[in-house]
Regions:
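Active-site/ligand-binding neighborhood in enzyme catalytic cores
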Residues: 1-91, 98, 315-334
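A glycine-rich dinucleotide-binding beta-alpha-beta segment and adjacent secondary-structure elements
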Residues: 40-53, 230-236, 290, 294-360
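Short coil-to-beta-strand
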Residues: 55-59, 248-257, 347-349
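Feature captures the FAD/FMN-dependent oxidoreductase FAD-binding
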Residues: 88-97, 102-110
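Mid-domain catalytic core of redox enzymes
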Residues: 102-107, 111-246
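Hydrophobic, well-ordered secondary-structure elements that form the walls
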Residues: 125, 171, 255, 284, ...
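Flavin-binding catalytic cores
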Residues: 176-177, 202-230, 273-313
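A conserved FAD-binding loop/helix module that cradles the flavin
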Residues: 356-382
Length: 386
């Protein structure tokens, strides 16, 4: 389409290259950037505390405008998965649920699951946890140079950790949508205190985790009091964007905030996870009821929550991460948009990677993009070998 190339693509290219240059110059952590431009520490906290630790500045500061432009499918985000399922089955594909892959053998191009079923493949696209892939891949029958490259990448993958996870509270409220529509929008961030978290979720939390065995339950709960009272909550009310998402006269609400997987893991090992989770829920409800949504607790019909452990258990995501890797100076995957096409490559023959672990920073758009890039590579391989 020469018209598209000359009228759209070529005029757009200089702006794209200029934007890429700006992005690459703003890779430093948002905390460092704000340190230089915002003198009030509480204000710095309120701006940055709902971002993952060391989030690149370009990603963090753009989010304030990007999330306002989000479009949601009618019926909820789950409709995306349903549409994908329907398309796969329409084209003759098969989806195996409740199945865990336990072995990948690139030499023989086979993989096995937890039911001891073996599958042969021509090309494999791994769209799940990358640490898992590098733990279960069997490389003994691969050439020595391939094994050497694989071991170097494997060490890098296993030496890094997933980013922070989230605690998500789901609420069923006996109150019409109009009541909440007078207070807020369908998706917003709310910080009840002007103080900011300070070191509550950084130094204080790390000190607590280092000496968790010596810290009593009461000390942990006192820390939790501060953590919830000073935090920032991401609140979603789907019914305000799609009225069919809630029964007449009722409202569904989703409240999320960043949470540390290791904390929940240590509480679980100490034997009081249910009590801790209930305590988190109660404190969140109290804060919201006392501030932005007066009387919310009195109108509550039901509730349930998802913890970092829940995400790990449901989808085998390392450290319960929801956006892939923790942000480090040396990332284990591609993190520059101009070479994003390389993000799907692995050292394993005929194995490609996609999803939130394949590129950093990640999210739904990059997960979709890496899926398309990996599919293109696999299709090209099939055509080449015909």
């Amino acid at each position: 389409d020469t018209s598209y190339i000359f009228r759209k693509l070529l005029p757009w290219m200089p702006r794209f290259l200029l934007t890429v240059g700006k992005i690459n110059r703003m890779q430093l952590p948002v905390e460092e950037f704000l340190q230089a431009v915002v003198k009030n520490p509480s204000l710095r906290d309120i701006i940055s505390q709902h971002f993952f630790r060391n989030t690149p500045t370009f990603f963090a500061l753009s989010y304030f405008s990007l999330y306002l432009d989000y479009f949601y499918p009618r019926g909820g985000v789950g409709k995306l998965a349903e549409a994908l399922r329907d398309k796969i089955t329409e084209l003759g594909g098969e989806i195996k649920t409740a199945t865990l892959v336990t072995r990948v053998s690139p030499g023989s191009k086979t993989l096995s699951d937890d039911k001891n079923t073996s599958y042969a493949y021509g090309n494999l696209i791994w769209a799940a946890d990358l640490k898992t892939l590098y733990r279960i891949a069997e490389t003994e029958d691969l050439p020595a140079e391939v094994r050497t490259r694989y071991e170097a990448v494997r060490a890098k993958m296993l030496g890094n950790r997933g980013g922070e996870s989230v605690f998500t509270l789901f609420l069923e409220v006996d109150e019409p949508l109009a009541h909440f529509g007078r207070i807020a929008h369908g998706h917003f961030f709310y910080t009840p205190s002007r103080q900011g978290l300070g070191e509550t979720h950084r130094g204080e939390l790390q000190a607590l985790l280092r000496d968790f065995g010596g810290a009593g339950k009461e000390e942990v709960l006192r820390w939790l009091d501060r953590f919830i009272a000073l935090n920032t909550f991401e609140v979603s009310i789907p019914g305000l964007k799609d009225r069919d998402m809630a029964p007449p006269g009722k409202t569904g609400m989703i409240v999320s905030f960043l949470a540390e997987y290791e904390l929940f893991k240590k509480v679980e090992e100490a034997g009081w996870l249910d009590e801790f989770v209930a305590g988190v829920e109660q404190r969140v409800l109290k804060v919201l009821s006392d501030t932005v949504f007066p009387g919310l607790r009195d109108k509550l019909m039901d509730r349930f929550s998802f913890t970092p452990l829940s995400y790990h258990q449901r989808i085998a995501s390392s450290e319960g991460a929801i956006v892939g890797w923790a942000f480090q100076k040396e990332m284990p995957v591609i993190n520059k948009i101009q070479i994003a096409d390389r993000s799907v490559l692995t050292p394993l023959p005929s194995v490609y990677q996609a999803g939130q672990w394949a590129y950093s920073p990640a999210g739904v758009p990059m997960s979709i993009l890496t899926g398309k890039l990996a599919a293109d590579r696999a299709i090209a391989s099939v055509r080449k070998n015909r």
